[in-house]
Amino acid sequence: MNKVYNTVWNESTGTWVVTSELTRKGGLRPRQIKRTVLAGLIAGLLMPSMPALAAAYDNQTIGRGETSKSMHLSAGDTAKNTTINSGGKQYVSSGGSATSTTINIGGVQHVSSGGSATSSTINSGGHQHVSSGGSATNTTVNNGGRQTVFSGGSAMGTIINSGGDQYVISGGSATSASVTSGARQFVSSGGIVKATSVNSGGRQYVRDGGSATDTVLNNTGRQFVSSGGSAAKTTINSGGGMYLYGGSATGTSIYNGGRQYVSSGGSATNTTVYSGGRQHVYIDGNVTETTITSGGMLQVEAGGSASKVIQNSGGAVITNTSAAVSGTNDNGSFSIAGGSAVNMLLENGGYLTVFDGHQASDTMVGSDGTLDVRSGGVLYGTTTLTDKGALVGDVVTNEGNLYYLNNSTATFTGTLTGTGTLTQEGGNTRFSGLLSQDGGIFLQSGGAMTMDALQAKANVTTQSGTTLTLDNGTILTGNVAGDSTGAGDMAVKGASVWHLDGDSTVGALTLDNGTVDFRPSTTTRMTPAFQAVSLALGSLSGSGTFQMNTDIASHTGDMLNVAGNASGNFVLDIKNTGLEPVSAGAPLQVVQTGGGDAAFTLKGGKVDAGTWEYGLSKENTNWYLKADTPPPVTPPTNPDADNPDAGNPDAGNPDAGNPDAGNPDAGKPGTGKPDAGTSSSPVRRTTKSVDAVLGMATAPAYVFNSELDNLRFRHGDVMQNTRAPGGVWGRYTGSDNRISGGASSGYTLTQNGFETGADMVFDLSDSSLAVGTFFSYSDNSIKHARGGKSNVDSSGGGLYATWFDNDGYYVDGVLKYNRFNNELRTWMSDGTAVKGDYSQNGFGGSLEAGRTFSLNENAWAQPYVRTTAFRADKKEIRLNNGMKASIGATKSLQAEAGLKLGMTLDVAGKEVKPYLSAAVSHEFSDNNKVRINDTYDFRNDISGTTGKYGLGVNAQLTPNAGVWAEARYENGKQTESPITGGVGFRINF
């Protein structure tokens, strides 16, 4: 480089000094230089030849508008406090140095080839280029300023402030840079940085070909390593973060609050995660040889991978079964591959998610660890939960052993199912939702388990000193039994229910409005055949209900056996069948206690056992079911289906209305002798099922006779309305009949129906004959005195003939067939619904004769006599509670005599005949047989005399059309009909 020097006299030193032609400040002024030109030339001639001397520049300003736009420093040249403005350039090379240079917008400082720059300040728009052996030390890069280090250049101690940038590229290097908030350091294409400190808000970008070593990331400082970039020995402190986007990192140390994020294509090797630090691996990210110390955390997302992981005690792994993870922990080797996790250790924030179709085997869930099993995920081997370890998931399938270790205080809400087992050793757990473990539940070492609003199906094995609590509506189905140490205690409260699935043993059982159910529930697998179940207790206290089963027919049933004291109040809700006991009246024990003041009562007060009802009896400290033996009372007269005892004077008296009361042979097997004598011996009370059968056996007779009664009014006025050549008629009828019966078999029969027919009338010499056919239908609702509502659907038809003459005589005959479709509905004493459907055929008829007399011009009288007969065929029926009944042929034979008094009026030109009627009827049938369970015979006696009273009116609207209406009241030994009504019409051809 060509340089021009001046030789000037320095008065202060008394010597000649060689200076650059650019020197002004601090030297002689230009006019003084001109005065010494001659002296200089002389000196040049006189002095010997010598090399050029180094130049020193202080406080120079270069750039556009200045005397000089550039400054070149080399070979020992120095410059201090230089200001480089827009367009100005300073070149520092070959031993030149610049100190405290200020580079403003548009200014450039080039440091290369052995040049050096110290303490430069790069402001907005200013640039410093360090290359080819140049070096820059302690540079400050401010907002908008840029330092570029490349091609062998180096920078040390650069401070990059907010908005400033440092680029280290193409063989450049930077050491000990400090990147502050908002500042950036870019490293790429062979650039190397070391010991960079990235502070709050600062950013370091390591790109393709760049490398960063010993970087320290402080609060919110970030290091971004993209594809082809590498970072080594990075230290990540609290709030700092390293992001690997295809780049690689080795030897990273992550401290409390620090984070490393490894994304797609990124890799990290030999990372150490200290307490509070976290390494996060995303899809297609890969880490290897990560060491997790106590309190540190490795999180691997689905599609990410981590290998050769060292999980120290207290270290946490957060991952799922769609990741690939392997390494060692306190329990040995662990791995996740192909949707299968093996030997995972989850503690101190560790979390494993098992996805649908995936599985986890031999998982250890420690304090603050979580195992999350999604629907379709499966647990195998031994899954262990300790301390505050948690199992979560909407649907968890356990095919292994789910083991809650001592001191576990875990809670579970969701569905836990599978063929595995659940073991709790010590601790206090709580389960809600749904639980089903085919392998059973094992409660050990003083453990306490609470089932809170849980639907559970599992057999439970307890040890002495353990406690199982059912609370808040829990339903448990399964056996509970002890082991060789004894049986644990149990509490059933808060409307909870325990369904026993077989014989069970409990230490101390406490009921707090809970229910223990011996019956098979919808979730059990018990066979339809009855199997008695026993519950053995050490002691019993509280209040609640025991729902039990008995089969008195085979003299067997469930047993509650309390070895110690029993105290409190308990209800026995006992179900039995309609089957007949082999040995009638033998007591059946249902409760045994070792002592105490416990009180047991029978729900409903009774239990059905085939034909008879049984009650609860106490003997010493034990309780038995025994056949009732109360005295008989008067039968009911006002049954009510909605309240079986309403209007029933024998309510609370179990044998009221028993026709065999006082008859020792009545109802005995095979006697068939209901009237074998009298006795003062107490009798048993029939069940509601028997009473319903007895009542339904008589219903066809009452239905048929009611229809036949209404049929006799088909003509209205037989002589006036029945005219040749004939006609058609129709009639609606409705009635409400209260029917008493033996053995409390009374009922209310409500009938609604119609009849319609047609006939032809033949005129004889002094009389007429009507011959016709008809069809009838009625719906008959039966409300049993002791509860239940049955129905008889009756349809039929027949033939009739009526003869009458001009003197007022008439004879009327009817033949009728009926089909009865019977639906029996009642319930047992325990509330179990009972039903049985069957059909019967019935045949019958009536014959009536009478005469109409004129009392005066308008009044008339019509006496008559009438007889009816009916027979329904016998029927074998079976109820759904197992009861059988043989209904014999039901017969009815009645005779009736009556009188109608009326008058004939002319109303608006129409003939109207109001009338009153009275009659007395007697039923002769008193021996209709019914046999129950092939054992007990009953006699339905429907005989008795009945008074009938009515009023009606016939109106002849036209010569060929008439209408009529009638209302009647009936009262007799067996029946009372407060009102029976009918309306009809006839049209003659």
From Swiss-Prot:
Residues 1-54 form the signal peptide. Residues 124-135, 639-667 have a biased composition (Low complexity). Glycans are attached at residues 74, 86, 93-94, 97, 100, 112-113, 116, 119, 124, 131-132, 135, 151, 154, 162, 170, 176, 181, 188-189, 200, 226-227, 230, 238, 248, 263-264, 275, 294, 305, 313, 322. Residues 721-989 form the Autotransporter domain. Residues 110-123, 136-146 have a biased composition (Polar residues). Residues 639-678 are annotated as: 8 X 5 AA repeats of P-[DG]-[AGT]-[DGA]-[NKT]. One of its GO terms (cellular component) is cell outer membrane. Its main location: membrane. SMART domains: Autotransporter (SM00869). Residues 629-638 have a biased composition (Pro residues). Sequence repeats lie at residues 82-100, 101-119, 120-138, 139-157, 158-176, 177-195, 196-214, 215-233, 234-251, 252-270, 271-289, 290-308, 639-643, 644-648, 649-653, 654-658, 659-663, 664-668, 669-673, 674-678. GO terms for biological process: cell adhesion. InterPro entries: AIDA, Autotransporte_beta, Autotransporte_beta_dom_sf, Autotransporter_adhesion, Autotransporter_pectin_lyase_C, ESPR, OM_autotransptr_brl_dom, Pectin_lyase_fold/virulence. Glycosylated by TibC. Glycosylation is required for adhesion to and invasion of host cells. Glycosylation is dispensable for bacterial autoaggregation and biofilm formation. It is found in: Cell outer membrane. It is a multi-pass membrane protein. NCBIfam families: autotrans_barl, O_hepto_targRPT. Homohexamer. The signal peptide, cleaved at the inner membrane, guides the autotransporter protein to the periplasmic space. Then, insertion of the C-terminal translocator domain (or beta-domain) in the outer membrane forms a hydrophilic pore for the translocation of the passenger domain to the bacterial cell surface. Unlike autotransporter AIDA-I, appears that there is no cleavage between the N-terminus and the C-terminus translocator domain. TibA-mediated aggregation is blocked upon capsule expression and fimbriation and is sensitive to pH extremes. This is Autotransporter adhesin/invasin TibA. It comes from Escherichia coli O78:H11 (strain H10407 / ETEC). The lineage of its organism: Bacteria, Pseudomonadati, Pseudomonadota, Gammaproteobacteria, Enterobacterales. The gene is tibA.
